[in-house]
């Protein structure tokens, strides 16, 4: 399924992996997409000695990512190709501590302070250009907070669920069965909605008070000049 050139790129991307990852696959022997899923994941696993596949018979089609023999909370009920292939790669890199899409430390601390358990399910279309950003943001949150789990679901493979939930647009994010978000979304926006629904653990919330000498509000020439002046003077 993967072109030889892409496999060579993946070997370079995965060269620095330190943890051992397993694609824990559960798929029906008669599922029409079984061969496609196994081919994709086995191709990815061939690109690193730190990635393996385990296949179990199941009633549907899904796989979970395990790290060093333990579940990570990230599950795909889909064949993550197309726009979602990057979501799979980033999930592995983030879990290994080498991802590039984490927010700043203050936002990460907010994620860690979320009260759990939180079970998220995101319904996507593999042709959707807005879906990967949401999937990747929620996977990153799952990596940061062990009380969060996240499933990405290809609606085309689970049309019965799409119909039952009356999903009209993608991505559609459900938090413990309750519709949380529909459409394009940024990390901070999604986090704010989760905080509103689940609350935060005050014992884990960031309590450090930061002091600043100056705050630059706005942009334009005046804002740029103020920022340059502050930097030259060593102001915080």
Can you annotate each of these PLM segments?
Residues 65-99, 174-202:
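Non-catalytic, surface beta->alpha helical segment in thiol-disulfide oxidoreductase systems
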Residues 49-59, 146-160:
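Thiol-based oxidoreductase modules, predominantly thioredoxin-like and allied folds used
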Residues 20, 98, 151, 156-158, ...:
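Catalytic cores of nucleotide-enabled group-transfer and carboxylate-activating enzymes in metabolic
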Residues 3-42, 111-152:
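Local sequence-structure signature of Cys/Sec-based thiol-disulfide redox active-site neighborhoods
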């Amino acid at each position: 399924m993967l072109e030889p050139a892409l496999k060579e790129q993946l070997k370079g991307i995965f060269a620095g992996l330190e943890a051992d990852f397993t694609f824990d696959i559960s798929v029906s022997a008669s599922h029409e997409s079984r061969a496609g899923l196994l081919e994709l994941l086995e191709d990815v696993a061939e690109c690193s000695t730190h990635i393996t596949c385990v296949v179990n018979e199941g009633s549907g089609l899904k796989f979970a990512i395990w790290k060093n023999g333990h579940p990570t909370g990230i599950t795909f009920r889909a064949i993550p190709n197309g726009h979602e292939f990057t979501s799979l790669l980033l999930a592995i890199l983030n879990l290994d501590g080498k991802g590039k899409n984490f927010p700043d430390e203050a936002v990460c601390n907010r994620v860690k302070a979320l009260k759990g358990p939180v079970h998220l399910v995101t319904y996507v279309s593999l042709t959707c250009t807005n879906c990967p950003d949401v999937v990747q943001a929620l996977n990153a949150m799952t990596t940061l907070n062990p009380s969060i789990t996240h499933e990405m679901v290809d609606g085309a493979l689970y049309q019965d669920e799409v119909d039952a939930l009356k999903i009209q647009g993608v991505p559609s994010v459900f938090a413990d069965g309750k519709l949380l978000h529909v459409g394009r979304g940024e990390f901070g926006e999604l986090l704010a909605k989760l905080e509103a629904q689940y609350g935060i653990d005050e014992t884990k919330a960031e309590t450090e008070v930061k002091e600043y000498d100056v705050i630059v509000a706005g942009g334009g020439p005046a804002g740029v000049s103020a920022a340059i002046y502050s930097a030259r003077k060593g102001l915080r």
